[in-house]
A protein has these predicted regions:
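Catalytic cores of carbohydrate-active enzymes across secretory and cytosolic contexts
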Residues: 1-329
Length: 329
């Protein structure tokens, strides 16, 4: 059976939907969900993700932890398998390691004279939080692929760096692909981590067959890290990291949008009403920005830039409407 005909397992922290009261289905937020929903609707897909809300946990329990069909608000249909980790483990995973530590490293946002300050609290959060949630999701994936020959598993983002190693240990025949949706920083930025944590992360992600990034510079940074931090032989021209008797392909895949989904949303009456409201509020000129409210988006710098623009060009006073549409992060 070709890889295009085999069932596909997607794994991410955040799933395509979350559930609210009364089985309300809400579309998952973030660029990862936006990017993957189009793929999921064109393949035989089971999407494994963390249960994010109390209603998600109840839905997982209702289906005995197994996959179940869902329909997104846009009408896309596929299977979802929600995994409930212990609240304590998930809190350490998300609020100590994934976001405050890994995300900051990969966006060069540490104030290195003060942070990170990695002590027992952080190392225990990695062992009993980050690794535990990765293990929970890995077990869910292994259950799904138990009877599938050479299963195809696509892992996503910085939340799940140790998961591929757990899959590889149990299923050496699996085809594992990991796409990192954020930058990959240069090797010196990773030296702030204790060696044990750093090597566990890198050996986990190098258990994949293919590792993908948005840009060639992120791809190059990752390969340089593998050479500098782990001493692996790297072929920069071919995009290969040699890990013992294995070759890991490292690729740059700029992630496309789901054009069909965008066109479908654009034709919705609600979008037309929103457009009319924007035009009603417009003066001679309109500046519209849409961002998630997180540090890497430089939201405050955008406001400052508009302030400088008005200082330098007073002729535009009262002639420009500036609207910032900020999504919770």
């Amino acid at each position: 059976v070709s890889s295009s005909e085999r069932p596909l397992i997607l794994v991410s922290n955040r799933g395509p939907v979350t559930f609210g009261p009364g089985d309300e289905v809400r579309r998952g937020t973030g660029g990862l969900v936006t990017a993957l929903i189009g793929l999921a609707s064109h393949r035989d897909v089971t999407w494994v993700a963390s249960a994010m809300t109390d209603e998600d946990v109840l839905m997982a329990e209702r289906h005995a932890g197994g996959p179940f069909p869902i329909t997104t608000p846009e009408g896309r249909e596929f299977r979802v398998k929600l995994v409930a980790s212990s609240p304590e483990a998930y809190d350490s995973f998300y609020n100590i390691i994934a976001n405050p530590m890994l995300w900051f490293i990969q966006h060069y946002l540490w104030d290195l004279s003060n942070a990170p300050d990695i002590r027992r609290h952080e190392t225990e959060a990695f062992e009993f939080g980050y690794n535990v949630v990765n293990e929970d999701l890995a077990r869910a994936v292994l259950d799904e692929i138990e009877e599938v020959e050479s299963p195809v598993v696509m892992v996503h983002d910085y939340h799940l760096y140790t998961l591929p190693g757990l899959i590889r240990r149990e299923r050496p025949d699996a085809v594992l692909h990991h796409f990192v949706h954020i930058p990959w920083s240069q090797s010196d930025s990773w030296r702030v981590l204790p060696t044990m944590i750093r090597e566990e992360i890198y050996n986990g992600i190098l258990a994949n067959d293919i590792v993908g990034f948005h840009t060639r510079s992120y791809r190059r940074n990752f390969m340089q890290c593998c050479e500098d931090l782990l001493g692996y032989e790297v072929d920069f021209q071919r995009g290969i990291v040699h890990c013992g008797d294995r070759e890991v392909w490292v690729r740059a895949y700029p992630l496309p949008i789901d054009s069909g989904g965008v066109l479908s949303v654009a034709s919705h009456p609600r979008v037309h009403r929103f457009e009319q409201e924007l035009l009603r509020r417009r003066r001679d000129h309109l500046i519209l920005r849409v961002d998630r409210a997180d540090l890497s988006k430089n939201v405050l710098r955008g406001f400052s830039a508009f302030d400088v623009f008005l200082e330098q060009h007073p002729e535009f006073h009262e002639k420009v409407t500036f609207i910032a549409q900020l999504m919770p992060s």
